[in-house]
Amino acid sequence: MGVANDSSPEYQWMSPHRLSDTVILGDCLYFNNIMSQLDLHQNWAPSVRLLNYFKNFNKETLLKIEENDYINSSFFQQKDKRFYPINDDFYHISTGGYGIVFKIDNYVVKFVFEATKLYSPMETTAEFTVPKFLYNNLKGDEKKLIVCAWAMGLNYKLTFLHTLYKRVLHMLLLLIQTMDGQELSLRYSSKVFLKAFNERKDSIKFVKLLSHFYPAVINSNINVINYFNRMFHFFEHEKRTNYEYERGNIIIFPLALYSADKVDTELAIKLGFKSLVQYIKFIFLQMALLYIKIYELPCCDNFLHADLKPDNILLFDSNEPIIIHLKDKKFVFNERIKSALNDFDFSQVAGIINKKIKNNFKVEHNWYYDFHFFVHTLLKTYPEIEKDIEFSTALEEFIMCTKTDCDKYRLKVSILHPISFLEKFIMRDIFSDWINGGN
């Protein structure tokens, strides 16, 4: 029997490092460096004491704080030009259906609550093992189009995140009530709270108040004010009413420039593209080449990402040309950025069978499932594509579907087009800027 390594499917079942009931995959130095900056056991006094604390303030005392010159610019929203990370803190950058993501220095740290009653810790490793397996088996520059996590910690106690969220929520509730001269209460209406928070979050006076109260009340190096409404939707969603925010995984990634969906016309030009549509062709072509090269690997014609869409494609600096050979052609990318596929949480390849995807799919799928969804989301994200008649017409070949066989952009029926369909598609003149270096 061969020795399993991270280029083999069996790698996902290995436990290279053990710490009681937790496991670390990948680089322990990266992981331990991040963990040393987190207090997983931080707790706070009961909420009733926080309520009593805010009874010491009123509109007048808050006005005095607002008149103070001190302002912590990290409490502005990150899309605000006034935002600046003045501390080495964890800054909340995103919360989706399955993960809460923070940025610290040049790292991205993702916390994923796992349904431990459904899966064992080692059955939740696809986000680490699948891209690592692909990266180690792909031979050419196509491997540069994959985001590999540096490290992943399994089965960690993550209750501190939900506790922190509740503490910040209660602070914001009481602060807003004090500003409005209302009776203090920890009861809230989701709609009323979000309206009040969104009306104030960009106000310099409100940020001054946060600069005072967040350190005093929260006293944490985890800043969740940015995109707090997304975290609110995550924890308050009715489908998680009885959810146990107990254990999950911690994943360390390199920090990207942007996700692909954040690029507009102005940024596309700034990045060196002739137009936004040329940029869209660029990310489509790179993803297509990645899939084709994966399907060339032995036993990898079952690869599925299961969530291929613009916000799961990240952009990184590219310091040298990316050259990918396909049959008698070579695709040359001289752009100063590259796109890279991220978020393999629901992916599968070769012998790495993902129970999460297996339980969700009732019929067999292949690459076409991913690109059908990808094209739908591209057209939704970028209506500008319609201005390029040739490109938009070609993309429609991926979405010849009806309500009967497609639900929310996802195929419900099995359509197993061969990968040669995609190979022929990218040989068209649509992508002539990159075929044989544009010659």
From Swiss-Prot:
Protein's cellular compartments: Host endoplasmic reticulum; Host endoplasmic reticulum-Golgi intermediate compartment
Gene Ontology, cellular component aspect: host cell endoplasmic reticulum; host cell endoplasmic reticulum-Golgi intermediate compartment
PTMs per UniProt: Phosphorylated in vivo. Autophosphorylated in vitro.
Keywords, ordered alphabetically: ATP-binding, Host endoplasmic reticulum, Kinase, Late protein, Nucleotide-binding, Phosphoprotein, Serine/threonine-protein kinase, Transferase
InterPro entries named in the record: Poxvirus_ser/thr_kinase (IPR008790), Prot_kinase_dom (IPR000719), Ser/Thr_kinase_AS (IPR008271)
Domain Protein kinase: 87-439
Catalytic activity, EC: 2.7.11.1
Active site positions, chain numbering: D307
GO molecular-function terms, A-Z: ATP binding; protein serine kinase activity; protein serine/threonine kinase activity
Residues involved in ATP binding: I93, S94, T95, G96, G97, Y98, G99, I100, V101, K117
Taxonomy, superkingdom: Viruses
Catalytic activity: L-seryl-[protein] + ATP = O-phospho-L-seryl-[protein] + ADP + H(+); L-threonyl-[protein] + ATP = O-phospho-L-threonyl-[protein] + ADP + H(+)
Reported induction: Expressed in the late phase of the viral replicative cycle.
UniProt enzyme class: transferase
Protein family per UniProt: Belongs to the protein kinase superfamily. Ser/Thr protein kinase family.
Role according to the record: Essential serine-protein kinase involved in the early stage of virion morphogenesis.
Protein name: Serine/threonine-protein kinase 2
Organism, scientific name: Vaccinia virus (strain Western Reserve)
Gene from which this protein is expressed: OPG054
